[in-house]
């Protein structure tokens, strides 16, 4: 179901599974319980932006929107929604009310923090958050990423950010969309070739 009336209907971030099996065709969408914790920021191509230990790993940031502390034991994170238990958050991890939790996407357990043991594809991937019952709480599918820039949740969906693990999101400076032009395309490629579209940034 489409859940963000101000968002882009072409963005997967603005859609979620229905709360009722089979959906509600021809009727208003069912509302469900508000999530306690959400995906808030993702950095999938960390070249030099943020270090953790001696390396620059990718990360996922969670945000507590419940207004009270949430114990995250047996919550899980995965880049494959069919395998929700790729990384189980260990016992004793608490995310404070209105707080943030950074999970590093590597296996360097000598470095500070939590480490998921898997990485994301900077050409596009999916990341999903599951509660202890194995129910999907939040998910985002994203495309090709910009080096050293994260994507962060905003009131209008997900936008390009400056990486801020453990802190409030900070939008990155971007050009006016009016400066973007359709510059060239091929609609009838030769045999074995692909059609394509080229965009040009005039800014």
Q: At which residue positions do the language-model features occur?
A:
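Intrinsically disordered, low-complexity linkers and terminal tails enriched in Ser/Thr/Pro/Gly
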Residues: 1-203
């Amino acid at each position: 179901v489409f859940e963000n009336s101000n968002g882009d209907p072409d963005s997967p971030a603005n859609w979620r599974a229905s709360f009722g099996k089979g959906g509600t065709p021809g009727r208003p969408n069912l509302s469900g319980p508000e999530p306690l914790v959400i995906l808030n920021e993702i950095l999938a191509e960390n070249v030099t932006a943020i270090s953790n230990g001696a390396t620059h790993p990718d990360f996922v940031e969670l945000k507590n929107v419940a207004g009270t502390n949430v114990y995250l034991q047996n919550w899980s994170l995965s880049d494959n929604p069919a395998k929700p238990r790729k990384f189980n958050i260990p016992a004793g991890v608490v995310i404070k009310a209105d707080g943030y939790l950074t999970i590093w996407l590597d296996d360097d357990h000598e470095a500070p923090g939590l480490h998921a043991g898997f990485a994301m594809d900077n050409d596009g991937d999916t990341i999903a958050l599951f509660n202890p019952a194995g129910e999907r709480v939040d998910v985002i599918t994203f495309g090709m990423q910009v080096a050293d820039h994260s994507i962060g949740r905003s009131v209008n969906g997900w936008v390009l950010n400056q990486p801020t693990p453990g802190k409030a999101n900070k939008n990155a400076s971007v050009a006016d969309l009016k400066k973007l032009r359709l510059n060239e395309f091929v609609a009838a490629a030769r045999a074995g070739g692909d059609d394509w579209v080229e965009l040009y940034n005039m800014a």
